[in-house]
Amino acid sequence: MEGSKRKHDSRRLQQEQEQLRPRTPPSYEEIAKYGHSFNVKRFTNEEMCLKNDYPRIISYNPPPK
């Protein structure tokens, strides 16, 4: 049990160190390896509202001329 606690603490310390380090832009090899995952970001409330509006905007048909 004591060993598992120690492992958890070291993992948390590693995450804190990663947050402190400035993020470098991904190299071409990393982009080729991981693809779109670099562009994935957390949604803010505003972005979520915009995302929810898309189906209504797309389904809107302009009146025929």
Curated annotation (Swiss-Prot):
Residues 11-21 have a biased composition (Basic and acidic residues). The keyword Transcription does not apply. It holds the Pfam family Orthopox_F8. It comes from the Viruses. Keywords: Early protein. Residues 1-27 are annotated as: Disordered. Induction: Expressed in the early phase of the viral replicative cycle. Disulfide bonds: none annotated. Residues 1-10 have a biased composition (Basic residues). Belongs to the orthopoxvirus OPG052 family. This is Protein OPG052.
